[in-house]
């Protein structure tokens, strides 16, 4: 994602973190919101199914509830989907799958790394 376009996206979105570890994403543009949410919330339902988080849509906000790691992954996926929608004018199922796959794989790789206390040279 280009840095300039990311700045534009983050200006269009507002992130609100709650004490119960949920994240609310507020959209300022209803057209973008409807594109990201999808017809009959289909994109959010797919994202919810793939991520294992609970995703709610109300007004101009998307609310993500789950554990903190999954919430952040879904938040980044929604930012990615917003970028895709603004660039292409539409979203496909592959965009939804790839948005989460990219971030889930990164998180999985972070979890699999172990820190080394010693390095032995031979």
What annotation goes with each model-predicted range?
Residues 15-35:
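Short glycine-/aliphatic-rich beta-strand segments at the starts of folded cytosolic domains
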Residues 56-119:
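Interdomain "pre-motor" coupling segment immediately N-terminal to P-loop NTPase/helicase cores
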Residues 32-49:
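Short amphipathic alpha-helix segments
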Residues 1-16:
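Acidic, low-complexity intrinsically disordered tails
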Residues 49-51, 58:
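N-terminal assembly/transducer modules of large multi-domain enzymes
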Residues 43, 50, 80-84:
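Conserved short hydrophobic interaction patches
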């Amino acid at each position: 994602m280009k840095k300039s376009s990311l700045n534009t996206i983050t200006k269009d979105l507002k992130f609100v973190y709650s004490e119960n570890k949920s994240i609310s994403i507020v959209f300022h543009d209803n057209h973008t919101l409807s594109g990201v949410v999808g017809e009959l919330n289909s994109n959010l339902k797919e994202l919810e199914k793939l991520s294992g988080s609970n995703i709610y849509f109300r007004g101009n906000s998307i609310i993500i509830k789950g554990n903190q790691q999954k919430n952040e992954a879904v938040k980044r996926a929604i930012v990615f989907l917003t970028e895709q929608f603004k660039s292409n004018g539409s979203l496909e199922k592959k965009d939804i799958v790839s948005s989460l796959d990219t971030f889930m794989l990164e998180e999985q790789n972070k979890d699999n790394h172990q820190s080394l206390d010693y390095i032995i040279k031979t």
